[in-house]
């Protein structure tokens, strides 16, 4: 993925992770997963509910937070 794509993706996922915001993740095949983002990298998202699932980013269609979240596209992952 290009660096430009990371400029929005990483701060958004990081804000969801840090604030423990519950999310619904819709996969390209229509399956809905729910939980909290535990961690992420360039290729995968770790989603925690009763178990931790490794979800490949290429399989994700949409990430929907349960509540509004403020994030800054220029912030870094920590």
Swiss-Prot record:
Q: Name one Pfam family in it.
A: Hfq
Q: Which UniProt keywords apply?
A: RNA-binding, Stress response
Q: A Gene Ontology biological process annotation?
A: regulation of translation, ncRNA-mediated
Concerning InterPro entries, the annotation shows: Hfq, LSM_dom_sf, Sm
Q: Which residues form the Sm domain?
A: 10-69
Q: Name one GO cellular component term.
A: cytosol
GO MF term set: RNA binding
Keyword Transcription attached: no
Q: Which domain of life is it from?
A: Bacteria
Q: Does the record bear Ion transport in its keywords?
A: no
Instruction: List all disulphide bridges recorded for this chain.
Output: none
Q: Which family does it belong to?
A: Belongs to the Hfq family.
Question: Entry's NCBIfam families?
Answer: Hfq, PRK00395.1
Describe the subunit structure.
Answer: Homohexamer.
Explain the purpose of this protein: RNA chaperone that binds small regulatory RNA (sRNAs) and mRNAs to facilitate mRNA translational regulation in response to envelope stress, environmental stress and changes in metabolite concentrations. Also binds with high specificity to tRNAs.
| The protein's name in its UniProt record | RNA-binding protein Hfq
């Amino acid at each position: 993925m290009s660096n430009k794509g990371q400029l929005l993706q990483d701060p958004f996922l990081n804000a969801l992770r840090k604030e423990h915001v519950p999310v619904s993740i819709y996969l390209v095949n229509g399956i809905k997963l729910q939980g909290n983002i535990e961690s992420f990298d360039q290729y995968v998202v770790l989603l925690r509910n009763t178990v931790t699932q490794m979800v490949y980013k290429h399989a994700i269609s949409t990430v929907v937070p349960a509540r509004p979240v403020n994030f800054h596209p220029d912030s870094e992952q920590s």
